[in-house]
Amino acid sequence: MSRERTLIRLPAAVLGLAGVVMTPGVHAATVISEALYDAAGTDNGNVFVELYGTPGTALDGVSLEGINGSDGSVYLTLPLSGVIPGDGVFVVADDAGDGSSLVDNADLVVNMDFQNGPDSIVLRDAAGILDALGYGDFSGGVFAGEGNAAPDAPAGSSLARADPLADSGDNLSDFTVLDTPTPGSVPVSSVPLPPALALFLSGMGGLLAVSRRRAGLAV
């Protein structure tokens, strides 16, 4: 069953107003948040894997792997690079053949060809597996995802986390089929609040509270 997500992508200008300074961080909180591995028509330049993580996290040393569901072998390895932007969303998109991609909001363009299910996509760094998504019917196959497999999305549809902040360790529970893929967007409730902005808003709230108390005393 397909479900809709209420989505938002924060412009960099908004984050800039908060005086945010991004610095490289660890990879532990980075997860696979959406994957379109079978586009309607040609896959060339149209498929993607979206990651969600802490803004400012450097992805050097992180890779995506395609795991064959028939024998568990690694058939594709994609070394990643770049830094997760201020909205926490990083889109790894397929190369259309000229160094560009047809995927919206692409942050990194690579030659990508993930197979249809049953297969798995694994996100890892030097320390081990960060996240994994298995999709399709693994009866008699090798499952490299988490918990129970997500369904095999039909052509043109993606698999997406209903909430990128929630990782129960079960692909079937965490992922849903989206009829309309949403690369570069996440549910509004999941947009991370930069620390500087959170501090600013907290301070403003305190000032307003003091002003109200003083106004009450003056009456």
Task: Go through the PLM ranges and name each one.
Residues S168-S190:
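A recurrent domain-boundary module in secreted/ectodomain proteins
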Residues G16, V26-H27:
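Cleavable N-terminal signal peptides
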